[in-house]
């Protein structure tokens, strides 16, 4: 594993931040040089909350790249989709700034995990979806799913979008932290999605995030 990977989710609040932190921690433990980035953080002022969570899970302090703003190039105060948060803050989202920051991180680290906002179809600007940006940059995707009710539908829609846009799925991460309280639903979601991943993206990895992994 080497290069830049885009971490997206099948929905909002699916566990992307925790999953990104845990994956980075595991890579660190394997001796990899890894950093996480939150290119667009909304609902914050000066520091990206998600980056702070990543560092806590990774067990490391804020890095020099964090202090330089490379891991959090765009921060908006209103907690909403990037296109709306930017509009309400009265300024445009700077895609060149984001691209440059990611490139600088990629030059310094072996692996860069880029955590997106929400799912693949979230608008970054009025004219650009997250999935458009991923395709433009050529990033493989790490997709976060779960065992909660509705996850099968949302995951298959995400699969269809990735195929339509010709984007490589690196791995599907099944997040047990958001499992349904109904054990039948959670287990069936796991079994079904594991089979569909093999059919739809045979080269993609299946990963599971246990409830204790983020502790």
From Swiss-Prot:
It comes from the Bacteria. Pathway: Cofactor biosynthesis; biotin biosynthesis; biotin from 7,8-diaminononanoate: step 1/2. GO terms for biological process: biotin biosynthetic process. Substrate binds at residue 42. Transmembrane segments: none annotated. One of its GO terms (cellular component) is cytosol. ATP binds at residues 13-18, 50, 115-118, 175-176. It is found in: Cytoplasm. Its EC number is 6.3.3.3. Mg(2+) binds at residues 17, 50, 115. It catalyses: (7R,8S)-7,8-diammoniononanoate + CO2 + ATP = (4R,5S)-dethiobiotin + ADP + phosphate + 3 H(+). Its main location: cytoplasm. InterPro entries: DTB_synth_BioD, P-loop_NTPase. It is an enzyme of class 6 (ligase). Keywords: ATP-binding, Biotin biosynthesis, Cytoplasm, Ligase, Magnesium, Metal-binding, Nucleotide-binding. Homodimer. This is ATP-dependent dethiobiotin synthetase BioD. It comes from Neisseria meningitidis serogroup A / serotype 4A (strain DSM 15465 / Z2491).
């Amino acid at each position: 594993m080497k290069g830049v990977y885009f971490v997206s989710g099948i929905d909002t609040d699916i566990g992307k931040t925790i999953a990104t932190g845990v994956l980075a921690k595991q890579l660190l433990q394997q001796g990899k040089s890894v950093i996480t980035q939150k290119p667009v953080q909304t609902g914050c002022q000066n520091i990206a909350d998600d980056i702070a969570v990543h560092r806590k899970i990774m067990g490391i302090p804020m890095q020099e790249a964090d202090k330089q703003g490379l891991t959090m190039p765009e921060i908006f105060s209103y907690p909403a989709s990037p296109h709306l948060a930017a509009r309400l803050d009265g300024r445009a989202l700077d895609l060149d700034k984001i691209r440059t920051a990611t490139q600088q991180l990629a030059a310094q680290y072996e692996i860069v995990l880029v955590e997106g906002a929400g799912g693949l179809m979230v608008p970054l600007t009025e004219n650009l979806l997250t999935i458009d940006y991923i395709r433009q940059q050529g990033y493989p995707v790490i997709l976060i799913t779960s065992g909660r009710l509705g996850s099968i539908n949302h995951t298959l829609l995400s699969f269809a979008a990735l195929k339509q846009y010709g984007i490589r799925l690196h791995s599907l991460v099944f997040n047990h932290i958001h499992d349904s309280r109904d054990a039948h639903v959670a287990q069936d979601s796991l079994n079904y999605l594991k089979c569909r991943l093999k059919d739809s993206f045979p080269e993609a990895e299946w990963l599971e995030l246990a409830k204790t992994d983020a502790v």
